[in-house]
């Protein structure tokens, strides 16, 4: 193995000098810096600067590094443990356990985090819908098993709560394996999620990988690949159906932007790295289903300043089968989950996949909500009295639909005191069909807010009247 020395340290960037007569390490190779206290720092090769110098990104703090320290080339990219040994554990970007448990034995298989995407002839597509128990998702933007879904939203509109509810609903009803990857998010949320999953019994079928907000950009940029490598092994070696949760894919882009600037690359639009589309493609193309098994991916996507044209969310859009857009104006109306039913999309919402009845009800719901949106200007200026009888009916039913798209979440029960509701897709379709048909025009609008099934809305109406 080649041995070099630290030439200079600029924050998380470390330049390493190798002897002229030695082969330089390859791009993406992991190098180990020997610290004075005997510990090792892992750094990853990014650029060959010439004159036997390589520029690297540190995966941990570079505090205490000095010029002249020894650096060893491992001869391979970062390798992380895979397989059954990862279940029930929490790892960092290097695949080291951070949950206080036993170290992973050396006998456990390890795979490099940098790998090629599956070949075209290995891919498989599915038309099976994944039931989530969340009405607005199951009705209007159904998720495909083996598909990729994005939860888009600005700050504080409920992306993490929604992804936690999806983990609660799908992971508990799903007998397969789940991999949760926390990319640049709050450590407190990761800690809470670990203990909640432990208490609910889901943890034993879950591997968790965290690279949180306080970590250097190198760790945040690579932690997504660590989680994905673990998910790929369950898919390829064991033929499992894997659920891959990523919170938050924007932080992956953000970390890449930080690293790009530190490496001296000229930024592109809005200050992002010029390699944004390439980096996103390399990650997203590996999240796919093959003939051996499937990876169903649900990714939270932060939208900076609620601007969907920002290059980071705009680049992510292109890779997804379904999008769930969270809207701030709905949170202001107290409608949770604050999913925008008109902006959210899914390639699975076709009669061939969801069935004629479901498709008919979903398109009618969207039609009513769209008409209501168009009539809102007239209502705000002239009032309801200026509408025709038909328009008044549309508005009244659309408001009931809007409230009925909300529901209480199990993961929010400790804050709201309202038990969470899992609503089967048949009950969801039936409930909205009854509202569209006018069966519940006599019930107060408030009865439809924050309930599960249509029967619960009827029950709530009786309580409101009494």
Swiss-Prot record:
Domain of life: Bacteria
Binding site for ATP: 153-160
SMART domains, alphabetized: AAA
Cellular component GO terms held in the UniProt record: plasma membrane; proton-transporting ATP synthase complex
Keywords assigned by UniProt, alphabetized: ATP synthesis, ATP-binding, Cell membrane, CF(1), Hydrogen ion transport, Ion transport, Membrane, Nucleotide-binding, Translocase, Transport
Membrane topology: Peripheral membrane protein
Segments traversing the membrane: none
Protein's cellular compartments: Cell membrane
Reactions that this protein is recorded to catalyse: ATP + H2O + 4 H(+)(in) = ADP + phosphate + 5 H(+)(out)
GO molecular function list: ATP binding; ATP hydrolysis activity; proton-transporting ATP synthase activity, rotational mechanism
Entry-linked Gene3D superfamilies: 2.40.10.170, Bovine Mitochondrial F1-atpase, Atp Synthase Beta Chain, Chain D, domain 3, P-loop containing nucleotide triphosphate hydrolases
Enzyme Commission number, as recorded: 7.1.2.2
Record's subunit section: F-type ATPases have 2 components, CF(1) - the catalytic core - and CF(0) - the membrane proton channel. CF(1) has five subunits: alpha(3), beta(3), gamma(1), delta(1), epsilon(1). CF(0) has three main subunits: a(1), b(2) and c(9-12). The alpha and beta chains form an alternating ring which encloses part of the gamma chain. CF(1) is attached to CF(0) by a central stalk formed by the gamma and epsilon chains, while a peripheral stalk is formed by the delta and b chains.
Stated family: Belongs to the ATPase alpha/beta chains family.
The protein's role, per its UniProt record: Produces ATP from ADP in the presence of a proton gradient across the membrane. The catalytic sites are hosted primarily by the beta subunits.
Record-given protein name: ATP synthase subunit beta
């Amino acid at each position: 193995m080649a041995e070099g020395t630290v030439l200079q340290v600029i924050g998380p960037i470390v330049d390493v000098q190798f002897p002229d007569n030695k082969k330089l390490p390859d791009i993406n190779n992991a190098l180990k810096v020997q610290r004075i206290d005997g510990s090792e720092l892992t750094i990853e090769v990014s650029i060959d600067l010439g004159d036997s110098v390589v520029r690297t990104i540190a995966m941990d703090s570079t505090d205490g590094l000095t010029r002249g320290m020894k650096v060893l080339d491992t001869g391979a990219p970062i390798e992380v443990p895979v397989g059954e040994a990862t279940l029930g554990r929490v790892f960092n970007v290097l695949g080291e356990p951070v949950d206080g448990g036993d170290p992973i034995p050396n006998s456990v298989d390890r795979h490099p985090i940098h790998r090629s995407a599956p070949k075209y002839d290995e891919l498989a597509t599915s038309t099976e819908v994944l039931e989530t128990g969340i009405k607005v998702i199951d009705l209007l933007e159904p998720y495909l098993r083996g598909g990729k879904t994005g939860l888009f939203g600005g700050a504080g509109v409920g992306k993490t709560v929604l992804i936690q509810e999806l983990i609660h609903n799908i992971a508990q009803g799903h007998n397969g394996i789940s991999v949760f990857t926390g990319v640049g998010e709050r450590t407190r949320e990761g800690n809470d999620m670990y203990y909640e999953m432990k208490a609910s019994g889901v943890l034993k079928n879950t591997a968790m990988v965290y690279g949180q907000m306080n970590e250097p950009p190198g760790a945040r940029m690579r932690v997504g690949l660590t989680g994905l490598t673990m998910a790929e092994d369950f898919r390829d070696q064991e033929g499992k159906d894997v659920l891959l949760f990523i919170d938050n894919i924007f932080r992956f882009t953000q970390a890449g932007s930080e690293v790009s600037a530190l490496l001296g690359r000229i930024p592109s639009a809005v200050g992002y790295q010029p390699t944004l589309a390439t980096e996103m493609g390399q990650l997203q193309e590996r999240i796919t289903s093959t003939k051996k098994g499937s990876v169903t991916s649900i990714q939270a996507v932060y939208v900076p300043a609620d601007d969907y044209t920002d290059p980071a969310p705009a680049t992510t859009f292109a890779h997804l089968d379904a999008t769930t857009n969270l809207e701030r104006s709905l949170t202001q109306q107290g409608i949770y989950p604050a999913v925008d039913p008109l902006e959210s999309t899914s390639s699975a919402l076709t009669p061939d996949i969801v069935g004629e009845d479901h498709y008919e009800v979903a398109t009618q719901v969207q039609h009513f909500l769209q008409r209501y949106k168009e009539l809102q200007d007239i209502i705000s200026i002239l009032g309801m009295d200026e509408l025709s009888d038909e328009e008044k009916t549309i508005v009244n039913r659309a408001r009931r639909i809007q409230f009925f798209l909300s529901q209480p979440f199990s993961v929010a029960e400790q804050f709201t005191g309202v038990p969470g509701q899992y609503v089967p897709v048949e009950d969801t379709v039936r409930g909205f069909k009854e509202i569209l048909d006018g069966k519940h025009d006599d019930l107060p609008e408030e009865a439809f807010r924050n309930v599960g099934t249509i029967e619960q809305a009827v029950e709530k109406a009786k309580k409101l009247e009494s």
